[in-house]
Amino acid sequence: MAVITISRQFGSGGQTLGKKIAEKLNYPFADNEIIQMVAKEANVSSQWVENIEKEAGTNLSRILSKMVSQKWIDRVLADERGYIDEKIYLDYLVLIIAKIADEGDVVILGRGSQYILNDHPDAYHILLIDKKESRVNFMEKHYNLSEKKALQVVNFEDRRRVSLYKKLGKIDYEDPSLYHLVLNMNRIDMDTALKLVCEMVTQK
């Protein structure tokens, strides 16, 4: 049984590699499914969870949380509809990622899974890094963005990830000692990365 977590600098190809690993090993790939599971537990829409996730740790999130009145929350609860904010999202995130890992043989993309499963005996933690220029180029190529827009997205996601990890009490997500394998995607191609991860997992 193996649990593979994929952490990455945004635009380094983590989602692409994660899907390839899952396909190669015939493992499920946990990404958007995590959003759906959080939404189900909190009794809210997946879109609501996506919005919370996108703004986790940002100033906008804190501003919005202050704007939500207790009266509004009481009305939502009275209607037996759920409610979720940044803290509730993080609490559910920890529980759900741990639950997914307990089922075994899975690839989990991001969301602080390398921290949440740090002590999991069957977990392999992978980090992808790359030069910012290459990450911007990756976003242009794979998501059909202009160079300006791709740079904006990469910068925003870099800041958002740091904020999210701070909320989890961690600020050192690029510390190589957290990971079994760090892949510099500026030095190797996707096929080599796939081979390295699969060999590591299957040779245990």
Where are these regions (language model features)?
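Extreme N-terminal starter segment of soluble prokaryotic enzymes
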Residues: 1-4
